[in-house]
Amino acid sequence: MSLHEINENVKLAREYALLGNYSSAIVCYRGVLEQIKKYLFTVRDSSFQQKWQQVWQEINEENNQVQEIMRTLESFQLETTPSKPPSNQDGINDIWPVQVERRSSPLPVRRPPVPYKDSKPHNNRLSVAGVRAQHRQSPRGANGDRAKPLKGKEKKEAKPKDDKNKAEVSEKEVKRFDGQGYDKDLIEALERDIISQNPNVKWDDIADLEEAKKLLKEAVVLPMWMPEFFKGIRRPWKGVLMVGPPGTGKTLLAKAVATECRTTFFNVSSSTLTSKYRGESEKLVRILFEMARFYAPTTIFIDEIDSMCSRRGTSEEHEASRRVKAELLVQMDGVGGASDNEDPSKMVMVLAATNFPWDIDEALRRRLEKRIYIPLPSAKGRVELLRINLKELELANDVDMAKIAEQSEGYSGADITNVCRDASLMAMRRRIEGLTPEEIRNISRAEMHMPTTMEDFESSLKKVSKSVSASDLEKYEKWIEEFGSC
């Protein structure tokens, strides 16, 4: 989670509210509030915490205002029961009473019925004002769908300039999944798992793993760039399984795939697709794939897939778990990426990651056609990881990254990050040793930012041990040799 993501989600929520799409705005506002709550746990400065709490309250107030608008609109819809369709084209005149309109608005006030031809100049002026005002002011539509182009005669008689503006608005609108027939709460729960339209993680942000990057580009990225080539027998792969020890960068690779493909990115885990109510877990799986097809091209990243799709037929397996696995297998086989008559640019790619590939069901292993190994970083990769982690720190002249990389052989990417974090705190620990809390608060900022020395890294390497054993590496290599598909 980053401040950039929070900022973009706030902009998206406000844009939805301005366009009258209040239900989508509420979903975005709720997501932002949860993101800020999580971010508050990482903030240590009390002054920053107070500022973020104030931001949370302001955004929560905006959310409450949008909810109040929705309740007002719903009350109007319940109270208005016309016996026949309104005489005008859009029926706008019969929705809002005269006293509601206190200022200039894209909606006309209630007037006595007059023939349409007599009010032609007036309606044209109002339609132009409506198109402009709904981008600058908070709209007050009856059903939250004010951004649609005008209908009927008004659409034909509008000025060409207004038609161009409306076309631009419709292109910028974000399409929304119509979950008719499904529980609204289930759809909103899955919408919160859409990380971003663009996770903004590039290949260069990931150290080493050149072979894995090459395979993922061929399996996922190239079909988006060369749709005419990847047809027939060359159709894109249905799914990719990334296998490897913990902390080797499998999640980062998934985000890089979504960024390079410009796809919608679903981050799914076992908690997303499980429910205490009978039958809802299977519905969640089906809704997930229907939403993925709607927002295609889409990348569905299922982390720790072994927790959902372990082997079937074992004594520990529950009936509910078996039904979820069956639905997931059916939906994955139905996605199919792109066949002879389908557009590869509208594919749905299932990207999975696991630390226990030997526990995965055989049918799922067959559907994940590409199975690649994400190993521990090499010596060159460890040096690159050190440079990425230490780019914001001031280092002493005696720091030798090549030597640190040599001493950290067998460490995963997460282990190397922990070593760098621990070493960066060494100077601060030495500075505050033996001081009282009052003296610590009075230390200047310049004194706290001391250079990190080679001795700090050597001490951290002694304190931080490897998280992956040699026996585990042998198991991964044996499995990938038997079932790998690189």
Curated annotation (Swiss-Prot):
Entry-linked PROSITE patterns: AAA
Binding site for ATP: G244, P245, P246, G247, T248, G249, K250, T251
Notes on how activity is controlled: ATPase activity is stimulated by microtubules, which promote homooligomerization. ATP-dependent microtubule severing is stimulated by interaction with katnb1.
SUPFAM superfamilies: P-loop containing nucleoside triphosphate hydrolases
Reactions the enzyme catalyzes: n ATP + n H2O + a microtubule = n ADP + n phosphate + (n+1) alpha/beta tubulin heterodimers
Biased composition (Basic and acidic residues): 143-174
Subcellular location: Cytoplasm; Cytoplasm, Cytoskeleton, Microtubule organizing center, Centrosome; Cytoplasm, Cytoskeleton, Spindle pole; Cytoplasm, Cytoskeleton, Spindle
Keywords: ATP-binding, Cell cycle, Cell division, Cytoplasm, Cytoskeleton, Isomerase, Microtubule, Mitosis, Nucleotide-binding
Protein name: Katanin p60 ATPase-containing subunit A1
Organism whose genome encodes this protein: Salmo salar (Atlantic salmon)
